[in-house]
Design a protein with these regions (language model features):
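Peripheral, non-AAA+ core regions of ATP-driven protein-machinery
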Residues: 2-13, 17-81, 88-96, 101-108, ...
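Conserved Rossmann-like nucleotide-cofactor binding loop
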Residues: 128-129
Length: 456
């Protein structure tokens, strides 16, 4: 007879189980991800049984009706934008982020807004006491009696409370503190996180309850726990930002009910998180005047144009291997663009240290900011000042050509709205933009023409 409790090794990345430790996971091919956990085979076999569905009946696809009422507005337009228009009933939403970034504050504000709409909301905390939550809530504002708090880590107890009170919205803070009694391993382990999420998914789908799950991230910036966790939930949101800065960016990386390209911008204040309605104006605040190596570029996140400042500092290196750093964008992309400048216009950069930064702490990897990076590098290297009313966008290829990008007209419209007077853009995008905006449009076909544009 097999032992009820045995030890097994689980991959922390994908949840693969092995009877012995392995250096590389055969499922996800990651290295050094196996940890040993105690597994109760009897409990797992009992918990894994599925009750027979006596009333299960297939429904024709044409008979299923959908309506806008299935989405619940959070009264936070920035969050609704990322969610795809609001919270879908019966959805399971995972919110990840670094400790102290503001995940709990964001969801507490969501609870405040939803309970104010006479929706029953249950906030379950496994990290803070009721008194600690009350102190944080007083800083945010007044709350409705439709919001109930529960300090509990036992998933069985939480399930009993949900089945008894039948709330419409549930917040679990956090999934790493939840404990399923049918799993013998410690809270936060691979088995616990996977099984607990599975139970919450059954509750959300079976009772048509929208559930928000808070998840901590690892040092690599991904949600702690097995990768299967992100596959189980309907929506994955990452709350990004620097704890030493006031801005916060909510980014959707998975959404079964909407786009994954949208972002929401917030500002952390003493009264909580405040939405930033115009991120472009916010990102450009504090931009220095008459400084070389600084240029404004336009990027698109989903359907929203965002103007941002790209800074570059090129200086002589006193080391055999020049230092190159990139903050807010892809490091390899910066190296590629510097190689293009050396090859296509003969700009000597091999003996220079290069520092590229996207001001404001926002991270952008869209190819449309290539031209902005190139102009910032050329401006710093040649000590040229680019007029503060000039904006640019465009993708740069390996031949030095400036390629067209999507939604060029929306980018120019956003720049015109903020008072920019000159726009350097791909020449192929000029016909799509037209002459409807009171801006000087300079079309460039390659990086040589882009250099001429900032020198004149």
């Amino acid at each position: 007879m097999a032992k009820a409790k045995t030890s097994a090794f689980f991959c922390q990345n994908c949840g693969y189980e092995s009877s012995k430790w392995m250096g590389q996971c055969p499922a996800c091919r990651e290295w050094n991800t196996f940890v040993e956990e105690l597994v109760d085979r009897k409990a797992l076999s009992t918990s894994g049984k599925i009750k027979p569905a006596t009333e299960a009946k297939p429904v024709p696809l044409s008979a299923i009706k959908t309506s806008d009422e299935e989405r619940i507005s959070t009264s936070m337009p920035e969050l609704d934008r990322v969610l795809g228009g609001g919270v879908v009933k019966g959805s399971l939403v995972l919110v990840g982020g670094d400790p102290g970034i503001g995940k709990s504050t964001l969801l507490l504000q969501v609870c405040r807004n939803l309970s104010g709409q006479n929706l029953s909301v249950l906030y379950v905390s496994g990290e803070e006491s009721l008194q600690q939550i009350k102190l944080r809530a007083e800083r945010i504002g007044t709350f409705s009696d439709h919001l109930e708090l529960l300090c509990e880590t036992s998933l069985d107890t939480i399930r009993t409370v949900i089945e008894r009170n039948k709330p419409q919205i549930v917040v679990i803070d956090s999934i790493q503190t939840m404990y399923n009694e049918n799993v013998s391993s410690a809270p936060g382990s691979v088995s616990q996180v996977r099984e607990s999420t599975g139970v919450l998914m059954q509750i959300a789908k079976g009772m048509d309850i929208s559930i928000f799950i808070v998840g901590h991230v690892t040092k690599e910036g991904v949600v702690a726990g097995p990768r299967v966790l992100e596959h189980m939930v309907d929506t994955v949101l990452y709350f990004e930002g620097d704890r030493h800065e006031s801005y916060r960016i909510l980014r959707g990386v998975k959404n079964r009910f909407g786009s994954t390209n949208e972002i929401g911008v917030f500002e952390m204040r003493t009264e909580g998180l405040v939405e930033v309605e115009n991120p472009s104006e916010y990102m450009l605040s504090g931009k220095p005047k008459d400084a070389s190596g600084s240029v404004v570029a336009c990027s698109i996140e989903g359907t929203r144009p965002i103007l941002l400042e790209i800074q570059a500092l090129i200086c002589h290196s006193y080391f055999n291997n020049p230092r190159r750093t990139a903050t807010g964008t892809d490091f390899n992309r910066v190296n590629l663009l510097m190689a293009v400048l050396e090859k296509r216009i003969g700009m000597q950069l091999t003996d220079c240290d290069a520092y590229v930064n996207i001001a404001g702490g926002i991270r952008m990897n869209e190819p449309a900011i290539d031209l902005g990076i190139v102009l910032a590098i050329m401006s710093s290297k040649l000590d040229l000042t680019i007029d503060e009313k000039t904006i640019c966008f465009g993708e740069v290829g390996l031949s030095g050509e400036v390629r067209g990008v999507s939604m060029a007209e929306q980018r120019v419209a956003e720049a015109a709205k903020l008072g920019f007077e000159v726009c350097i853009l791909p020449k192929v995008s000029l016909p799509s933009v037209g002459k409807k905006y009171a801006m000087k449009l300079i079309g460039v076909a390659n990086v040589r023409e882009a250099l001429d544009a900032i020198q004149t």
